[in-house]
UniProtKB/Swiss-Prot annotation:
Domain notes: Has 3 domains, the large (RuvB-L) and small ATPase (RuvB-S) domains and the C-terminal head (RuvB-H) domain. The head domain binds DNA, while the ATPase domains jointly bind ATP, ADP or are empty depending on the state of the subunit in the translocation cycle. During a single DNA translocation step the structure of each domain remains the same, but their relative positions change.
Protein name: Holliday junction branch migration complex subunit RuvB
Residues given in the record as Mg(2+) binding sites: 65
NCBIfam families in the cross-refs: PRK00080.1 (NF000868), ruvB (TIGR00635)
A GO MF term: ATP hydrolysis activity
Residues annotated as binding DNA: 290, 309, 314
Length: 347
């Protein structure tokens, strides 16, 4: 998949660490999560114990890694980071765990992609702070138990449904990360402009925030691109007109949809009469992977009410048709109304 400026996935060019908040008090958004973490961190420090294991789950780009780093900083302990696909063997996990200091934070991104065999080794490490390893092969093989210092495992996943039940149940503090409100994103964008050292008016910040898809990572990326256009054009301070012109050049529309999103909507509308159409069929038609559609493209379209997921496939809503300048077929509106009523009765 080609790189998208509105993609919530991590991009090497996003590594501007100065834009990240350094404490829970500086962290904008996810208020309930932050308030709860403050309590748990204070209690752990008062007891002199390791914080219970934490699981952050939700769409990408919402601050899971940043919160994990802040937790370690506020606990006053070390921070180690890795990701699920990187840990291939039990020895890799053992090397990570045995090098931790007491109460350190170990962050595993994409924890749903851990090898099942690695999960089995991780269970006693999380529960009893012990590592059981098999040394050698055949008749000479023997089990070795390694005592570990108490530590905090922080897992992050964009697909909590793929976590096995035993692993999920070992996290004492599950935290759901939600998309950000426009006012929260405006505060993030305004702070980002100050950190990057350029003048941004309140209406300029609102324009960038409105197109950021409820995601701070996208907001930071759009802000840097708007800054580039403003520097070349010699415009300061950056107001809504400058931001609008820059974002239009990037093909990011008024609600944050880009060319890929509009292609997705048009494919359902024009090729399949608004749906329903299966995700595999859509992936083939758009030359994208199923995972890309489910994890990157669809979450924001669902949140905006542009599409519906049904047992028979994806359907375009009336607002989805309207956004691409088309009128929905009457029979499709009847189907959507029926599905809505069925959902309401099911609740």
């Amino acid at each position: 998949m080609t790189s998208r400026v509105v993609s919530p996935e991590q991009n090497p060019n996003d590594a501007e660490m100065s834009l990240r908040p350094q404490s829970l008090d500086d962290f904008v958004g996810q208020r309930q999560v932050c308030e709860n973490l403050k309590v748990f961190i204070s209690a752990a420090r008062a007891r002199g114990e390791a914080l219970d294991h934490v699981l952050f789950h939700g769409p990408p780009g919402l601050g899971k890694t940043t919160l994990a780093q802040i937790m370690a900083r506020e606990l006053g302990v070390g921070f180690r980071a890795t990701s699920g696909p990187v840990i291939q063997r039990a020895g890799d996990l053992a090397a990570l765990l045995t090098n931790l200091e007491p109460r350190d934070v170990l962050f595993i991104d994409e924890i749903h992609r851990l090898n099942p065999a690695i999960e089995e080794v991780l269970y006693p490490a999380m529960e009893d702070f012990q590592l059981d390893l098999i040394i050698g092969e055949g008749p000479a093989a023997r089990s070795v138990r390694i005592e570990l210092p108490p530590f905090t495992l922080v897992g992050a996943t964009t697909r909590s449904g793929l976590l096995t039940t035993p692993l999920r149940e070992r996290f004492g503090i599950p935290c759901r990360m939600n998309f950000y409100e426009p006012a929260e994103l405006e505060a993030i964008v305004s702070r980002g402009a100050r950190v990057l050292g350029f003048a941004l008016t309140p209406d300029g910040a609102a324009e960038v925030a409105r197109r950021s898809r409820g995601t701070p990572r996208v907001a930071g990326r759009l802000l840097r691109r708007v800054r580039d256009f403003a520097v070349v054009a010699g415009r300061s301070p950056v107001d809504a007109l400058v931001a609008d012109a820059a974002l239009n050049r990037l093909e990011v529309d008024r609600i944050g949809l880009d060319a890929m999103d509009r292609r997705y909507l048009r494919c359902i509308a024009e090729n399949y009469g608004g749906g329903p159409v299966g995700v595999e069929t859509l992936a083939a038609a758009l030359s994208e992977s199923r995972d890309t559609l489910e994890e990157v493209v669809e979450p924001y379209l669902l949140q905006q009410g542009m599409i519906q997921r049904t047992p028979r496939g994806r359907m375009l809503s009336a607002s989805g048709f309207k956004h691409i300048g088309l009128n929905p077929p009457k029979d499709l509106l009847v189907q959507l109304d029926l599905l809505t009523r069925m959902d309401e009765e099911g609740e």
